[in-house]
């Protein structure tokens, strides 16, 4: 089982995707401050995980709708900006265009030490609509992530902090044994506790911690 951001991907893919999208649709920059505010409030104990989920979920939905409405982002995938797309179709087209172009330019950020194997599981707080494409390109089909309703782009699950072990068991199975777990953060201690062996990743240096 591998954490994604900072572990096998060099950086934070959601932040990189956000800044990448701002190059084509500057309007999305308005969503940065609210997300940071929710994160700081949660970190300082002024908001519960449930409150952060609702707040971040609402901002994410607004952001994805801005992406879907962007004529410049639609052009990334070769779609005509006046193609008459509407509603759910427009959302899917816009997000797909952005995600595909992002990974066209960022797959080289996958760290060289990582060699995908068919039974690998990727565990991440990133969303399935973004991380799923990276997994597809790596030849992987098991992703435990935050999820978005593809019809409405509303967040249905935030795979974060204490939610991770619960979400892992829901997706992979309650009796699944983790032989090896790789992460870049001690915040993943609950997952480290579940694994037979665990490794801390810093850049391309890997240290066994369990």
Residue ranges and their predicted role:
Residues 1-48:
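Active-site neighborhood of HAD-like aspartate-dependent phosphohydrolases
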Residues 50-109:
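Metal-dependent phosphoesterase signature
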Residues 79-80, 91-94, 98-210:
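C-terminal cap/substrate-recognition subdomain and adjoining C-terminal extension
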């Amino acid at each position: 089982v591998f954490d994604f951001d900072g572990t096998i991907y060099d950086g934070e893919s959601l932040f990189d995707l956000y800044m990448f999208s701002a190059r084509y649709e500057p309007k999305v920059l308005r969503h940065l401050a609210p997300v940071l505010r929710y994160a700081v409030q949660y970190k300082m104990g002024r908001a519960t995980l449930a409150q952060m989920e609702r707040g971040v979920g609402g901002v994410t939905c607004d952001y994805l709708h801005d992406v879907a409405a962007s004529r410049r982002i639609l052009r990334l995938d070769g779609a005509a900006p006046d193609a008459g797309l509407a509603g759910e179709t427009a959302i899917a087209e816009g997000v797909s265009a952005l995600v595909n172009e992002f990974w066209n330019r960022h797959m080289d950020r996958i760290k060289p030490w990582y060699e995908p194997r068919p039974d690998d599981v990727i565990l991440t707080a990133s969303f399935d609509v973004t991380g799923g494409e990276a997994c597809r390109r790596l030849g992987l089909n098991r992703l435990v992530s935050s999820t978005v309703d593809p019809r409405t782009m509303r967040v249905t699950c935030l795979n974060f902090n204490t939610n991770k072990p619960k979400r892992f068991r829901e997706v992979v199975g309650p009796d699944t044994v983790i032989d090896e777990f790789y992460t870049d953060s001690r915040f993943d201690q609950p997952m480290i506790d579940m694994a037979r062996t665990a490794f801390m990743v810093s850049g391309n240096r890997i240290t066994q911690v369990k």
